[in-house]
Amino acid sequence: HRSTAAEVFHTPLDQVTPDQRRMAKVINFGLIYGMSAFGLAQQMGLDRQVAAAYVDEYFHKFPGVKRYMEKTRAQAAEDGYVETAFGRRLWVPDITAPRPMVRAAAERAAINAPMQGTAADIIKRAMIAVDAWLRTEKLQAKLLLQVHDELIVEAPAEEIELVKQKLPELMAGAAKLSVPLIADVGVGA
């Protein structure tokens, strides 16, 4: 989100403020979810023309995003589904609905589904890898819970360092993408 803020707000990366990063996060996720300049203005408390300028600048700086959105929308309308990066089909039955509001919601879902679905596929692969490693190593640590892109593992004190070291490697290795996956680990009570 910091690099988006740097591009959209014409600010050096190391000078991006927390507020600019927060706004860039709203822009990044909002536009992918189909938010209009009007919605962006409301969400961020901005004048509509200012929000529209941010949207224009975003698509100017990141033209691939607009191409992706248009291509995905057209593909979904033609096939009735979209796919994750791993080929899992996500059906979008309302993509050709005659009612514009229903169709627009399906278009937003079609654009978002490959990203959310791919993220879901990756975390599931990570869960399988972590569980297999815990079993193979015969550790007492247990995979307890998955929350969005996080895995919660319960480990006895004597296994914490080993799990802390191995978990990010297993999670980052869950998929080979053109952009590396980076996983952080935290320890808490």
Question: Where do the model's predicted regions map?
Answer:
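Conserved catalytic core of nucleotide polymerization and phosphodiester-bond processing enzymes
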Residues: 1-189
